[in-house]
Curated annotation (Swiss-Prot):
Family note: Belongs to the universal ribosomal protein uS7 family.
InterPro entries linked: Ribosomal_uS7 (IPR000235), Ribosomal_uS7_bac/org-type (IPR005717), Ribosomal_uS7_CS (IPR020606), Ribosomal_uS7_dom (IPR023798), Ribosomal_uS7_dom_sf (IPR036823)
Primary role: One of the primary rRNA binding proteins, it binds directly to 16S rRNA where it nucleates assembly of the head domain of the 30S subunit. Is located at the subunit interface close to the decoding center, probably blocks exit of the E-site tRNA.
UniProt superkingdom: Bacteria
One Pfam family from the record: Ribosomal_S7
Protein name (Swiss-Prot/TrEMBL): Small ribosomal subunit protein uS7
Keyword tRNA-binding: yes
Length: 156
């Protein structure tokens, strides 16, 4: 148990365009070197592109896509008597969202489209269809947890 006081989580202000805390949080994941206006441009550009392609509400689309990428379980390394076991654990809700956002941004960055906004839009559209690198990452994590189910009694 830590002796220090537990720090309260900061409240994220909703984004100016859609008034969505989730999109504001996603912008923070996209942001590099504190350049929030650049991150805003990327995220809004990607959501506009998604809206053009699918003719749907971008916020609802983003929420639904994020839900498809969220992992339910993950593996954590646990040392028992000189051996390290990959122990499957359920992921808490806040971490689920954070991992999904991180995976989406990482997958988008590795794509080959010209701008980051186009890459992000492409990755969001792929994830909505159940394909793409972010979905593959989620499936890999779930597969690892399933493969190591035998060690689930080594809970933390």
């Amino acid at each position: 148990m830590p002796r220090r006081r537990v720090v309260a989580a900061r409240e994220i202000l909703p984004d100016p365009k859609f008034s969505s805390q989730t999109i504001a949080k996603f912008m923070n994941h996209v942001m590099q070197d504190g350049k929030k206006s650049v991150a805003e441009g990327i995220v809004y550009g990607a959501l506009e592109r998604v809206q053009e392609k699918n003719k749907v509400d971008p916020v609802e689309f983003f929420e639904a896509t994020l839900e498809k990428v969220r992992p339910m379980v993950e593996v954590k390394a646990r040392r028992v008597g000189g051996a390290t076991y990959q122990v499957p654990m359920e992921v808490r809700p806040s971490r689920r969202t954070a991992l999904a956002m991180r995976w989406l941004v990482d997958a988008a960055a590795k794509r080959s489209e010209k701008t980051m906004a186009l890459r992000l839009a492409g990755e969001l559209l792929d994830a909505a269809e159940g394909k793409g690198a972010a979905i593959k990452k989620r499936e890999d994590v779930h597969r690892m947890a399933e493969a190591n189910k035998a060690f689930s009694h080594y809970r933390f």
